Regions:
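Alpha-helical/coil-rich non-catalytic "connector" segments in signaling and regulatory proteins
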Residues: 1-72, 221-283
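Enriched - but not universal
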Residues: 5, 31, 62, 98, ...
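Long, mid-chain structured domain cores
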Residues: 26-133
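Cytosolic nucleotide-utilizing catalytic cores of signal-transduction proteins
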Residues: 103-283
Length: 283
């Protein structure tokens, strides 16, 4: 058998984790999506006439193919990109359930390929998922016989709704270039991969830089605040003195920026990302 994990049935009904392939007029072969390779996915796409064997519902259509309307209006979106270097088909379902449990603000998830999964998060109220995933990664890999790398995407507010598909694809393209070169398990922030990508040729798609810069410009005094924090190695008291404002006022702006974007200006990786974005404004 080519697909020993498959099963035959007399109707095309398949759950969200399966794909149904017509064998005859009254017989379909059901396969688990997680067991399919990229080549098999393309073959099934040709056989079924679908764009992809990994048809993950409305969010998949909206983000991957830029089709339809945003399935659910939320004030801020974040994408968690997961790539599995090693996995066992028998444990994928349990791993997905665990991920849905530890990401309480998840509103959807879908499969991009046999090794790639996306979780869509509602970050209207900020949930620090990076810390949760870093704390649990080793246990997850051990419990479910997996080796995976995770990228925490940037938080994008609803004002960029028309660009969500392009932003998602730009994020994922950067993540793919990362794991193709650095194949080890870890949890990485958007800032880490963005700064890594700056040093590579054509790794950062312009829309990422453009939209982040727009966010910075939308916040009062933020360019000056980022520059002052950079010059004072993120020491808030010194930066406030340089800006001639009260320390609490500066802290308010820092907290407001984190609430909007998840970026922490007192954390040097996030601060470096923001400083790179404002360099053209201050040079």
């Amino acid at each position: 058998k080519w697909f020993p994990q498959g099963r035959l049935q007399s109707n095309p009904n398949a759950n969200e984790n399966e794909v149904a392939i017509p064998i005859s007029s009254n017989q379909w072969l059901l396969l688990k999506k997680s067991s399919l390779t990229e080549r098999e996915q393309e073959l099934i796409s040709l056989l079924t006439g679908k764009d992809s064997a990994f048809d993950g519902g409305p969010w998949y259509d909206y983000l991957v193919h830029n089709r339809g309307k945003m399935p659910q209006n939320v004030q801020k979106l974040q994408f968690v990109h997961c790539h599995l270097f090693h996995y066992e088909n028998e444990t994928i379902g349990s791993w997905l359930e665990m991920m849905r449990t530890i990401l309480p603000n998840r509103i959807a998830d879908f499969q991009l390929s046999s090794q790639d999964y996306i979780f869509v998060l509602d970050q209207t109220r900020l949930v620090p998922v990076k810390d949760v995933l870093r704390d649990t990664l080793s246990a997850i890999e051990y419990d479910f016989s997996l080796t995976l790398t995770i990228k925490i995407g940037q938080i994008w507010p609803l004002i960029f709704k028309e660009s969500y598909s392009e932003l998602f694809q730009a994020e994922h393209a950067l993540f793919v270039k990362w794991w193709e070169q650095v194949q080890h398990s870890n949890v990485h922030s958007f800032s880490q991969l963005f700064l890594w990508g700056i040093g590579q040729k054509d790794f950062i798609l312009p829309i990422l830089t453009k939209k982040l810069h727009q966010l910075i410009e939308s916040q009062d005094q933020l360019v000056d605040i980022i520059a002052a924090l950079w010059e004072n190695t993120a020491v808030v008291t010194k930066a406030a003195q340089q800006l001639y404002i009260h320390r609490n006022t500066l802290q308010y702006h820092i907290d407001k920026w984190e609430e909007l974007t998840g970026l922490q200006l007192k954390e040097l990786t996030d601060l470096t990302l923001c400083y790179q974005l404002i360099l053209p404004d201050i040079l």
